[in-house]
Swiss-Prot record:
KW Zinc (keyword) present: no
Annotated compartments: Cytoplasm
Gene name as annotated: rimM
Protein name stated in the entry: Ribosome maturation factor RimM
Protein purpose: An accessory protein needed during the final step in the assembly of 30S ribosomal subunit, possibly for assembly of the head region. Essential for efficient processing of 16S rRNA. May be needed both before and after RbfA during the maturation of 16S rRNA. It has affinity for free ribosomal 30S subunits but not for 70S ribosomes.
SUPFAM superfamilies: PRC-barrel domain, Translation proteins
GO molecular function, one term: ribosome binding
Length: 169
């Protein structure tokens, strides 16, 4: 199955002509200007939608889809995810990763001591924070900074970290 990445969530309708307010889950909402198609995940099926128009309002993206011209045709999709294929995703700079690819990495210390699995990435504004769940069910919060994150290897599904004093009880 092809990897799909979530770029937004339909939060509400906008007007009566089929437009929707989308809460973007990407760090740059201007990326929506470059998109031609998105996949709507209805929960039961996935529908390809062609983007006809893109506008911005506060922290939202306003999208108009081709062939959807009525509020009644789109209202039922509130809360549903908008996805794109990996090939339509933006190119990332070195050291940048899709959160989707990081979830599930096995975290270990520099000496090889296993810590657990990366289960979540918190976006704090200053820097991201990796949530590592240990085998004992505890959580370790690792800031995504050079002092702490030493290596990310997606091929080996491994995250190597340096635990600075105070990160673990």
């Amino acid at each position: 199955m092809e990897d799909l990445l979530r770029v937004g969530v339909i939060s509400s309708t906008h007007g009566i002509k089929g437009e929707v307010k989308v809460f973007p889950t990407t760090d740059d909402m201007n990326r929506f200007k470059k998109l031609k198609m998105v996949t709507l995940d209805t929960g039961k099926e996935q529908k390809e939608l062609e983007i006809e128009n893109v506008k911005f309002f506060k922290q939202f993206v306003i999208l108009k889809f081709k062939g959807i011209d009525n509020i009644n045709d789109i209202e039922k999709y509130k809360g549903k995810d908008l996805l794109i294929s990996r090939e339509n995703a933006v190119d990332l700079a070195e050291g940048e990763f899709f959160i989707f690819d990081l979830i599930g990495l096995q975290a270990e210390e520099e000496d090889g001591n296993s810590l657990g699995e990366l289960t979540e990435v918190l976006q704090t504004g200053a820097n991201d924070v990796f949530v590592i769940k240990t085998k004992q069910g505890k959580e370790i919060l690792i800031p995504y900074i050079d002092d702490c994150v030493k290596k990310i290897d997606l091929n080996e599904k491994k995250l190597v970290v340096h635990l600075i004093p105070g990160l673990v009880e």
